């Protein structure tokens, strides 16, 4: 086994991103279907490591100590760039999107349990291949698998959960681009151009140019560091209470409170462009690390019936995004970008959703509403409603005892 330390892993992640960029610009298929650069590069590296593992018996182990801080830094930038006025304006849209998301959670579990029963598997495996890991991700999967082991005696719950979450992360990044590209073509907005081309003015005067200087970067890094520090403290204080929240949600909300508080007091205005640059860097590096570190041989160990459930879930996610998400959200360009985001966190995670949306907006134009709604629902509300839906399913007679 080869072990790469923190710095070597960072080098590998940056090279993976550059490789992904080269691939997307060189391979017409990837460019045509708007595959995110971290997904393209990360998957190629993961496949290369799989070949090394199977042919030579070599395994490369990465030091992922930077991965979680990078993810938290990304969510901090989402919070710092959110202003209260925009949140109020997006209230109705957030409500509609949340209803759409709840519908998917219910259907994912119904499909998982139905397919598991049809294939003669434990219904708990169907739940693990449902909203627990697909909409919930690795963290939610790990948390629920512990409960399944202790309460239901499902000894392989953790392995199944991690494999399903990994599969979902990969597919979530792959189907978002093609789905959105199809929807943009059929959008009610002429030529796929977004209705909202206005420059966001939450913290910036669009007519006044500002440089991203070293001082601005230091100020922005300080704000992000404060969000991470305070967010972790808040998460620890809430742990074990009825108000317990994942750390990244606490970090996001600290960012919202910090930026709006400073703005209201007139003490400091967050430089949106600098925050966005650092957020994009954090997200790209996080995704590169997450994907290049995938142990694809763990997917190969999944039984064919489990793979069958996951394939059905993936097809259903794409159809749901096209026929439900896009239509419910208005059948316009914003709705198409939202659908791409829904594919991302409906099968994988919120960072995958953001990467999907970035890949679309870089090509077709901005969608301020999508970048406001998806992080709010995907990073906060999804954990709450998913837990409620899962608990309701566990009350069914098939899970008694």
Curated annotation (Swiss-Prot):
Entries under InterPro entries matching the protein: GltS
Membrane-topology annotation of the record: Multi-pass membrane protein
GO cellular component, one term: plasma membrane
Bilayer-crossing regions: 7-24, 33-52, 70-87, 94-116, 157-179, 213-235, 245-267, 277-292, 302-324, 368-390
Cytoplasmic-side positions: 25-32, 88-93, 180-212, 268-276, 325-367
Periplasmic side: 1-6, 53-69, 117-156, 236-244, 293-301, 391-401
Heme found in the keyword field: no
UniProt GO molecular function: glutamate:sodium symporter activity; symporter activity
Matching Pfam families: Glt_symporter
Keyword set, alphabetical order: Amino-acid transport, Cell inner membrane, Cell membrane, Ion transport, Membrane, Sodium, Sodium transport, Symport, Transmembrane, Transmembrane helix, Transport
Cellular location(s): Cell inner membrane
Activity regulation, short description: Inhibited by the uncoupler carbonylcyanide m-chlorophenylhydrazone (CCCP) and the ionophore monensin.
Any coiled-coil regions, as ranges: none
Chief localisation class: membrane
Gene Ontology terms: biological process: L-glutamate transmembrane transport
NCBIfam families: gltS (TIGR00210)
Recorded family membership: Belongs to the glutamate:Na(+) symporter (ESS) (TC 2.A.27) family.
Cited function: Catalyzes the sodium-dependent, binding-protein-independent transport of glutamate.
Name used for this protein in its record: Sodium/glutamate symporter
Organism, as annotated: Escherichia coli (strain K12)
Gene assigned in the entry: gltS
